[in-house]
Curated annotation (Swiss-Prot):
Intracellular or extracellular location(s): Cell membrane
GO biological-process terms attached to the record: protein O-linked glycosylation via serine; regulation of protein stability
Entry's Gene Ontology cellular component terms: plasma membrane; protein N-acetylglucosaminyltransferase complex
Role summary: Required for polymorphic O-glycosylation of the serine-rich repeat protein (SRRP) in this bacteria. A stabilizing protein that is part of the accessory SecA2/SecY2 system specifically required to export serine-rich repeat cell wall proteins encoded in the same operon. The GtfA-GtfB complex adds GlcNAc from UDP-GlcNAc to the substrate protein, attaching the first sugar residue. Stabilizes the glycosylation activity of GtfA. Has no N-acetylglucosaminyl transferase activity on its own.
Subunit structure: Forms a heterotetramer with 2 subunits each of GtfA and GtfB. Part of the accessory SecA2/SecY2 protein translocation apparatus.
Protein's UniProt name: UDP-N-acetylglucosamine--peptide N-acetylglucosaminyltransferase stabilizing protein GtfB
Similarity comment text for this entry: Belongs to the GtfB family.
Biochemical pathway: Protein modification; protein glycosylation
Keyword Transmembrane: no
Major place of residence: membrane
Topological type in the membrane: Peripheral membrane protein
Length: 441
């Protein structure tokens, strides 16, 4: 049995963490390694790169640069300058001010990307991508001794593996098949979670397996994806399709009947270290001063303390809110302070425009905070129930809703329970029962 993911995105993280929480241990392989996979997750690049796992990520000011070149950096990204000419952009693994280098995008004299140096969680420059006509054309992967072990023609799609005399593979799928066979994984039952590369690998393995698609993407209406219909219309290794979104499953699950695959539902196990304590403390995490109807909410809710934090400096517009007694501002907030704020607040206001920072909404959800927002500002709508979504012109209604929840414990419990249900939350027992049934086939 094997987890096979195209990428280690949020859905893959949730699925793997749910398995671990339920004490289910299945080997996990990620096809596209971005360099920052968890130590327990495998990939072809990690296997042939053989990196020293005791090393740390590269900190931005440890980049090797020509003399007199300099780095200008914020919490979110960096730039390399030769006097006043920008030579490269630095992409960090996260925007939490840790400044761990993931990519350095080197620019030509026209300011376009010439090549990219890719760094991994162990501080190695493990890959380089070269551009031609402003498009990625060729990628080289390096092992721990800085030797090229794999080259990828990004235009033609084929690979050259310099291992054991050398191999040529016409596609990524053939390379992955070779890797899986080389690693001697048990391929009798594969769990995959996309209808792209994971499915392609499954379709190209011996037909005597029994695979399961865990489908986490939202459906567009009641229309199923074309590749899912293919699995329903043909006999393949895929015998099960498990929906992971509660709302989609509730809407169409009863109508899914098929001779080639069976259907089921299994959502996500989320950690909840605490319950909502109905404290009148509201949190906003933002790097933007575009916070919708903030003044109205502050004035309507004088008994609620508004904590507004940013990992950057704050604009004069935002700093002006210091005039209100029920507002506390935290510019250049530290990670420790963010953790404390998340623990101390019971309301999260998802009302800022621009990008979300620090996975704020997910963090609020896992802390059982009541998440409230405007329909135009929601960053993670799957964690916000319809009762907690408002039109931009409904700030008064939002204010009354927040106060009612704080004053009525039964209402708060109902809102939090619905918030968790609509986020597709399930129990450890649900996971053990479903995965156990699949393992016993």
């Amino acid at each position: 049995m094997l987890n096979l993911f195209d990428n280690f995105d949020q859905a893959s993280f949730d699925f793997l963490r749910s398995q671990r929480t339920a004490q289910i241990k299945i080997p996990t392989v990620v096809i596209n390694d971005d360099g920052f996979l968890p130590p327990e997750v495998e990939s072809p690049i990690k296997y042939w790169g053989n990196y020293n796992v005791n090393k740390k990520p590269l900190y931005f000011d440890h980049l090797s640069l020509p003399r007199y070149w300099r780095i200008l950096s914020t919490a979110a990204q960096g730039h390399i300058y030769d006097l006043d000419k920008k030579r490269a952009d630095i992409i960090y693994q996260a925007t939490d001010n840790t400044r761990q280098v993931k990519e350095v995008r080197w620019l030509n004299n026209n300011g376009k990307v010439s090549w990219i140096d890719h760094y991994n969680r162990y501080g190695y420059r493990f890959a380089q991508t070269y551009y031609r006509n402003e498009q990625p054309a060729w990628r080289k992967y390096y092992d721990k001794k800085n030797r090229v072990f794999l080259e990828w023609n990004l235009i033609a799609g084929d690979f050259f593996l310099d291992v054991d005399g050398g191999y040529h593979f016409p596609s990524l799928i053939e390379l992955v098949k070779y890797y899986l066979q080389t690693r001697h994984f048990k391929l009798d039952h594969i769990f995959y979670n996309t209808l792209n590369q994971g499915l392609s690998v499954s379709l190209n393995l011996p037909a005597d397996g029994s695979d399961t698609l865990f489908w986490h993407e939202p459906l567009s209406g009641d229309e199923l994806p074309g590749n899912m219909k293919f699995l329903m219309e043909n006999s393949t290794r895929t015998k099960h399709i498990i929906f992971q979104r509660y709302t989609d499953w509730q809407r169409i699950g009863a109508n899914l009947k098929n001779n080639h695959v069976d259907f089921g539902f299994l959502g996500t196990i989320y950690p909840h270290p605490r319950a909502n304590q109905l404290r009148p403390q509201a949190l906003i995490l933002t790097n933007s001063d575009e916070i919708v109807e903030l003044s109205t909410l502050i004035k309507n809710l004088p008994n609620i303390k508004f904590h507004i934090a940013a990992v950057t400096e704050m604009s004069g517009k935002l700093l002006a809110y210091q005039q209100y007694e029920n507002v506390e501002l935290y510019p250049n907030v530290s990670s420790a302070r963010v953790k404390q704020l998340i623990a101390d607040c019971d309301i999260y206001l998802d009302i800022n425009r621009q990008n979300e920072i620090l996975d704020a909404v997910r963090g609020a959800f896992e802390q059982n905070m009541l998440i409230v927002g405007f329909d135009e500002t929601l960053h993670e709508p799957q964690f916000v129930t319809p009762q907690n979504m408002f039109k931009v012109n409904e700030a008064q209604k939002m204010s009354k809703h927040i106060m009612a929840a704080l004053l009525k414990p039964a209402l708060m419990k109902e809102l939090i329970d619905t918030q968790r249900q609509l986020a597709s939350e399930v129990s450890v027992q649900d996971y053990q029962r479903m995965i156990g049934a699949l393992q016993s086939e």
